[in-house]
């Protein structure tokens, strides 16, 4: 979930056994088990890694390992893609600061790429806006029509209030 250059909105959901983090960027949905199950075997690798979560007081801690060798250890939308995720451990912490702010902190530990782990912290403000569909449109020819339709729906909804 390391932030990228754009589309950084996210929406978390929680059940008794899982946290799901829906990211606006490419509509990635990360399903994080909270039951302290073991990580997948070392030879099973996934593009988004293998996440496990637990609560540490009021902080959700998510540790993700077992990335593929083709997953960059740092987001390629910010850089050209740095390193290989094969030795990456990503540790994330989510803590609610107040009713409208979630503090997101992540630590990148990838000894094959970096000399030492590094940690970044980002306050994330609550938004009432929807998570938009992530879609690439060839030449954006249809964008004018989609936006016109959305504005018409908003206008109609405002008239009903």
Predicted regions and their residues:
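PEST-like low-complexity, intrinsically disordered acidic/proline/serine-rich tracts
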Residues: 1-161
């Amino acid at each position: 979930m390391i932030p990228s250059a754009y589309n950084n909105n996210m929406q978390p959901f929680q059940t008794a056994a899982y946290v799901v983090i829906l990211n606006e960027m490419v509509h990635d949905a990360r399903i994080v088990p909270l039951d302290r199950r073991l990580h997948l075997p070392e030879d099973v690798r996934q593009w988004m890694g293998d996440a496990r979560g637990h609560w540490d007081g009021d902080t959700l801690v998510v540790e993700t390992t077992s990335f593929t060798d083709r997953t960059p250890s740092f987001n390629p939308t910010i850089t050209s893609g740095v390193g290989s995720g094969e030795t990456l451990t990503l540790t994330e912490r989510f803590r609610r600061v107040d009713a409208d702010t979630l503090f997101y902190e992540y630590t990148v530990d990838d000894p094959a790429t970096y000399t030492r782990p590094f940690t970044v912290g980002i306050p994330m403000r609550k938004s009432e806006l929807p998570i938009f569909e992530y879609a690439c449109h060839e030449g954006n020819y249809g964008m004018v029509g989609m936006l016109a339709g959305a504005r018409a729906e908003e206008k109609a909804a405002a008239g009903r209030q």
